[in-house]
Amino acid sequence: MKSAAGQVAILYLIVLVGFICDKVKLFTEATAKATINLLLYIITPCIIIDSFLKMEYSPARAKKFFLALGLMFLLHIVAIVLNLPFFRKKGGPYNPIYKYASIYGNVGFMALPLAKAVLGAKGVFYCSSGLIAFNVITFTHGVRVMAGDNYKFDWKKLIVNPGVLGVAIGLPLFLLDVQVPTVIAQPISLIAGLNTAVAMLIFGTYLANTDLKTMFLAKGIYLVALFKLIVLPVSCILLFKLMGIQGALLVACAISASVPSGNNTFMFSSKYGLDVGMASKTVALVSVFSIFTMPVIIAFAQSMA
């Protein structure tokens, strides 16, 4: 396993490039929004499929994947339970935003690149299971938090999304030990290789368009950051260690638990009539803090692994 601090530093140097590119109008937020579709619908499924293709099948590895899937569901359940005492005041206009942001992390754009950087294909293999857990729980509990009285369950969004589709294609290929021809596997691998740079460049443009001054004045965001970046990952690492989880699987779970609040925070805020500005500031500030907390959390997990 590679140094977490070094790998996070590399990722955020790419974020800095994206930040600068936006400021000089070379790669702007408008361009990034169009690129998000490429990242979400093409690159993300490819990186998941590629991770399955690069893992040689064995019953032990298959068992590890399903164990990882169970742990990722447990991670979200732990987050929901630990979060119960927080943001309970009824009528608080920002409480749904804060609650969602403190539970649901950026498991696609942040966890997968970081897992690949720290653990390689094995890390993506484990963390891709987190996309299944995330989508199942965010489109049930998460939507309920954000929608409130307007909650309506949507099976289509639960099942038909890039993360789940990537696993739906890659997992059977892995379990059946299918030897995919190089002419197909190589393009998938090349597209998957774009994930880290593209995701971090987009994130840089996002930070460049956030009012960094006013976001530091919102006190509730600090509580979100404390819970999402420290309380949750440390609790999960200790719990999973007590359960006997170790090695790369423990570190992969720590990565998924330690990433900052997900972009769905402001997307759901827009859809359900909440304050999108506050949602954007929350995601941005928690993301800034994660620059310092993620290396520490992952290093802690590596020491426990």
Task: Name the predicted role of every residue range.
Residues 1-305:
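Alpha-helical transmembrane segments of multi-pass small-molecule/ion transporters
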